[in-house]
Curated annotation (Swiss-Prot):
InterPro entries per record: GfcR-like (IPR022854), PRibTrfase_dom (IPR000836), PRTase-like (IPR029057), RNA_pol_sigma_r3/r4-like (IPR013324)
BP term (GO), one: UMP biosynthetic process
Alphabetized SUPFAM superfamilies for the sequence: PRTase-like (SSF53271), Sigma3 and sigma4 domains of RNA polymerase sigma factors (SSF88659)
Domain notes: Contains an N-terminal DNA-binding winged helix-turn-helix domain and a C-terminal regulatory domain (or effector binding domain) resembling phosphoribosyltransferase (PRT) domain.
Superkingdom, natural source: Archaea
Molecular function via GO: DNA binding; orotate phosphoribosyltransferase activity
Gene3D superfamilies: 3.40.50.2020
Any Pfam family matching the protein: Pribosyltran
Similarity comment: family membership: Belongs to the purine/pyrimidine phosphoribosyltransferase family. GfcR subfamily.
Keywords: DNA-binding, Transcription, Transcription regulation
Name of the molecule in the record: Transcriptional regulator GfcR
PROSITE patterns: PUR_PYR_PR_TRANSFER
Amino acid sequence: MREIMNKELLKKVIELKSNGLTIGEIAEELNVSMETARYLVLNAEKLLKEEEKAIKLENVDIFIDWKNIGSSANRLKYISSIIVDILKSRNIEFDTVVGVSTSGVPIATLVASELGKELTIYIPKKHISEEGKKITGSISQNFSAVNYKRAVIIDDVVTSGSTLKECIKQLKEVCSPKLVVVLIDKSGLDEIEGVPLIPLIRIGAVNVEQK
């Protein structure tokens, strides 16, 4: 497989790295997996300097840029209204909306507000520290607790599902996760840790042989 590397993406990686962001934070910012973010951080400067247009990758990842939605509170409100409609159509009973930090938080906030539900924030371990230490994600103490509650989880993009898997495992220790809703799904998963996954948009790669 061959992956076309966008020069603007490479420049963005270099900028984020120079600003002191960790690999986990860069993965979150670009909506790519930790493996892809690590590869980009290690190779972006070389790729940009040599102006390579294509590199071979064992696995293809897709760069998602949804800032035209995220930069507007009004547009985010439209997205949250779609999620609210989905939740109502499924007749799911729940007590709190869990927003996965960072990008899932604004959407979760709007959904919780529209439905009159509590708001919980989950901070993944990739935002707490880098590799090498045994750490877990955490539930922010500044927002609603989840103990013994029914929860709907909201995130922006699911790539491999590892962050949501981590989140669900931790939540299951104290509450009952009912559903995961994401803006964009790149994983192709229908459920994570037994919890149904509902995407607004699902992205898949198709290999087309050139003749």
